[in-house]
Amino acid sequence: MDPRKPRQDPVNDARFYESLIKPPHLRTPDDIRNVYEQLRQLDTFSNLFIGPLKALCKTARYERHPAQYILFRDGDVARSWYILLSGSVFIENQIYMPYGCFGKRTGQNHRRTHNCLLLQESEMIVIDYPTEPQSNGMSPRTPPRGIHHSGEPVHQKTPRKSAPNMSVDSIAMPPPPVPPRPLRLPQTAAKGPAPLPPRGLPRTYPLDFPVDIPTTSSSSSNTSYNDQHRSQVYLNGLSADEDTLVRVKHRREKSNSVGGQAQNGISTARRLRGRSTASSTTTEGETASNEGADSDEDEGSMPSQESSSGGFMDLRDSVRECLEKEPSERNSEDLAVLLDFMQHMSAFAALPMSIKRQLCLKMVFAVVNDAGTVVLAHNEKLDSWSVIVNGCVEVVKPSGERVEYKLGDSFGAEPTPATQIHIGEMRTMVDDCEFVLVEHRDFCSIMSTIGDHIEKDRDGLTGEVVSEVERRTVGTHCGQVLIKGKPDKLIHHLVDERDHNVDPHYVDDFLLTYRVFIRDPTTIFEKLMLWFADSIYRDKVARLVLLWVNNHFNDFETNDEMWNLLERFEGALERDGMHSQLSLLNIACSVKAKPRQVILTRRKDDKMMMRLVGGQESGNSVYVAEVFPDTSAAREGVKRADEMLEVNQQSAKYLSAKKAEDLLTGSLSLTLMLKNNVLGYKETIGKIEHNKPKNGTSRSGAGIPMVIPVHKTSITGKKSSTTSSKSGMMEKLMTILKSSKEDSMDFTDEAKISSADLRPSRSNPDITSISQYYGPVRSECPEHVLKIYRNDQTFKYLPVYKETSAQNVVQLALQEFNMTAEGSPEWSLCECTVTIDGVIKQRRLPPQMENLAERIALNSRYYLKNNSRSEPLVPDELAPELLKEAQTQLLSLNAQVVAAQLTLQDFSVFSAIEPTEFLDNLFKLDSKYGSPKLEEFEQLFNREMWWVATEICTERHVQKRAKLIKKFIKVARYCRDLRNFNSMFAIMSGLDKPAVRRLHSSWERVSSKYIRMLDEIHQLVDPSRNMSKYRQHLAEVAQEPPVVPIYPVIKKDLTFAHDGNATYSEKLINFEKLRLIAKSIRGVMKLSSAPYEIASMAERSGGVVMDALLHMNSFENSNVATMRKGMSGKQNQPRKKVYEQALMVRKVKSYLEGLHVVDNEMELDSMSYDIEPQVQTAHRGANSSSTANIRRVPSPTPSSLSSQSAGSADQSSRHRLLFNGTGSISSAGGGSKFGVESPQAVQKMLSLVQNSKVKGAPPQITSPSTSARSSLQRNMPRVTGRQATSSAQGPVQLNEETSTVTTYYQSDNGRRQRSGSEGRFDNIPPSTFYLTSDGLTVSPRQSLSVVIPTHPHGHSPTSPRCRSRSPASSGCSSFSTIASIAATSMAAAPSAFVSNPYQHHQTVRGHVIGHRPMPIVTSGSATLPNHVSPRGLPPKSRPTILPGSHTNSSSRMGTIKEATFLTSEQVSRV
């Protein structure tokens, strides 16, 4: 393509800008349609329905602001959020590029938590939140730094540091010129060629462009029309005149993504009512140290029931709804849902996107209720192509060979017009099998057009195919998408002109996935450098490099060659005068760099290894100005612009450059903590240059490009003659960062301006470094309270900041104890600790030690000690008391605090995961960076899962065990309310361990309200249709991050996207596969794009989380947690209460850090049998017979019981094919078997569904006495133990889509693989499962923990016996097994297996069919009488399965450590 052609962008439409620029009250329906057609292409609105999106299009506004403009400040009321169209925005440590959204509210916080600076001239869409009353945390208050609407700072009564004159912010933007619109030139145009925005804009604009551009959207003055119209937008973003309110009613918990959180009277009353029932009875003592444990029987300590019933019990099954629609009734939203659901299925994996779309438009939905139904008879004509979307089927061929098809497999007609017949008999193997069918004629027509959509590009010399492109249609746009190609072609496509309407993420996907097929990234960068020399590609290459650095800075940090190329590119930007791009590059490098530890060794006669600049005397950190070659520093990777954070684990913020050099030359071994900070380094160099005499001849450093000098203003306000607009932008950026950190210092403005150096702030003395602009919690009052003792054991509570030093604490303590007459140098702060052995240790703290509240242990106290005395501060008789205070047990801890601490810890790891870690882990790449945080996140899931089982099985008292079970259910519920689904699922998995489920005496003491609570959580993770309910809910809450997703689901999606698609196809890179993986990773990364405001999220569910949770947690990441603004009402809390709250958090942290978990299934079984021995029955055979006779009646289809689907009952009666247990169609029109006598099965299905009716279960009449007896036993899981003998057990396969556990068998000589339900446990050691070749591929040195959670109570809480097998039935999934993959890296499986200690139990062989284990051959309690055939099994006359030959899967087997063994009681559930 010609690079000189205009760029194509997702919103590059002059009509769009013409419509958007119009005032909202002047827009016509055509204008709204123009805005809608463009916005619907953005990822921000990908999950938004038509109604809410059109409502936004009516009120969305256009704004354009100059570079260096402060859009909003920390503390301002958030009245709107933004979508960037062009330019770039800096918010804390993140740079936002075009088409990214920013400025959204977090939870119920209605105030900004960060400053926002425009780095370039930027255009944006402004979306106002609905107006709300001033209540709910919105009481008027003066922000920490008051500003006018133009961004001009105003002086407040309390002296604060003011930013320099920012008059540039108030400059009104001129109206645009007459079309065609020329290129925009920034203020630095005189210095060099101006860069284009990262993504261009249309070249023509309307003439009636408004001259008066609106000011910041945080302005309190808005047009009266906007105020009037915004009041008409409901909470879900739907306007009053829309007719799709029912469709988005389930999204009522959403707010920000569809226009905000309107706090109307109903929602306010609901929230207040929830708090009155959920938190008002939570007394003050509940947060104290001793009374902090919430009572299990207190309703007030329970999570809010209303929040659950509204947001989780009513989850729709959107996939089912879309499938049940007539093909002609499906719209674009339905199509998007179906494409997302089908993309992971093997039948669709190799098909082009255009073919998938056509198939989804033609497919019809069919349901087979009962297992054993004949779906296709032998020699029956095939008139459709079918895909299994739930369940599995089996084909028995005339030769006796059996072939099984599982979820995602296809069968039926081939895409040829010839008549085809089916060989063999196909039967369903489980209940509720679901299929999608495409008529043979339509299937042939669609598949015949594959060649029409694919174009191949061949080399002009060799004729070899170098790329394949597919023509796709997205909305109203049609364009070509590169799907396969040679590496060189993929690289060159970075600078080719692409149609961004149909392929907007190619650059992002390539920069993430190139490592799969290119080992050396320097080849890519060198080509970019060559293209940079061409003026045609220069701006485009500059944007590519900036995007690369901003998204994957670890590619440069861990590769010295890449770092050198980046410095070359930096010099090229300076040479060509591209200062704006260079500024962005410096900012990106500074904010994305991470601290690293370097160990330097030297000999006595070695010279200096590096040259340093800065230091305390200049008000800056110590920076590395130059690294000398052939030194230890060069070999260890020390770089120019590295900031020195620590030297031998001591802070370097008070070091001067001379002192640092002395340390380097005077030590033979040094441990340095370094962090690259180009921005701070260049500011330091700029200050040095500015302070030099004009005739000075000294150099600032060899080879240091002085690109962005920052010149300070004098007292008179005159700037240096060399100050330009670029330096003004950098000065303003640094001033914003500094003022945000110094706003609580009580210094006058005059004193700060007249100071030659920047005064260190309270929160960060080294303020010149942008890398130190970290602070998840910024409070205007002291965050901590210390309890300081004297030697007479009297104490005082002292409010302190996190940065208050030990020396300051001594001074405060002397004042509190009225000892001001004594000098503070005579006193010191000591920490007295009592060890487990009763030994009292005492140490004096350094005067400069900070963060004292987090440093102290539970078995320690702070004492005020006179330096002239040597008496012991803690007498011996107090030692036992200190040890008793240090003891922590789970039952004594507050469940909500435990859940919140788990959430913060998990999110701190999850948010630190780099996107490249997923690729490195998935493809097993040999990367220098690796996947450290991803592996840590994997371990967290396993640790939390094993912790639950260990804690319960360790407790020997049955009452306490029951309380522990209830405590864990509450913690899981709170985790769900906090959107920590990972910990929620881990806790559920721990509760569903067989060692826990078998504890009958404990479960029968768990009240029904906790069982209902557990059932609600189980419904959220219903495994049917690939956990569609969880995925739907995740898609909704993902619009308002943060969220901690379920890691096993992420791992499974990535694994099957990798295994189900080839990386190479005909010597070409299958980039479509890499797109799919990159899309999944991109969605996961968005979940951690905002910090946790955990207090607001807790209030949303009716609870209250103390501020101490955030104050007592220091994280490596800056965006882990944040405080809600406007918390002044909590500043007057008593010191004692604040201390007790912090003490509870310290106890929770100490408990979680000291967890000892048992990760061995057999050991847990032994512990479980020890605390609750197996109850032996007298007549197992009779018991089995009675069990077999209690068979449930046939259950209706899930959609008939699904209350989540709007209009599901009506559509189910029209569009579902229902079959009874005998194989006949349940309809008024006939009873013939499915497809046996009909040559046109599809037409027959479509005609029969009009008259088909749902088969309901007959009502069950029970007497009150029976109900009472049943209610006493309903919470007891019917599990008798894990029985095993020396006979071997069979391996278990993991189904890709539903995460169900199915069994197959295979001998050492290579028996035929089985992916279905039948399996024999032969020749496999106990507790060992294997994966098949079409499942997860596991290396021999890795293993997977198979998590199989089930309902522990065994029965439905609403009926004595659960009647339905449908997971959609409320409370009726007790007999199903939620099988999930915890695909985590664990230790290699041992070569020798521990023998089962319970050899006297007999072996059970069984089916695992659709989540339900079913017996086929039993000995012992699970024996079935001969006349009873377990439902769902093939006939008993089925021939014995002969072993086949399948050697490939044997070579790919990996041991799954400690998997779950099915007990006889489990398989007896029929």
From Swiss-Prot:
The lineage of its organism: Eukaryota, Metazoa, Ecdysozoa, Nematoda, Chromadorea. InterPro entries: cNMP-bd_dom, cNMP-bd_dom_sf, PDZ, PDZ_sf, RA_dom, Ras-like_GEF, Ras-like_Gua-exchang_fac_N, Ras_G-nucl-exch_fac_CS. Residues 478-592 form the N-terminal Ras-GEF domain. Belongs to the RAPGEF2 family. Residues 256-266, 1176-1189, 1260-1274, 1282-1308 have a biased composition (Polar residues). This is Rap guanine nucleotide exchange factor. Expressed in hermaphrodite-specific neurons (HSNs), oviduct sheath cells and lateral seam cells. Coiled coil: none annotated.
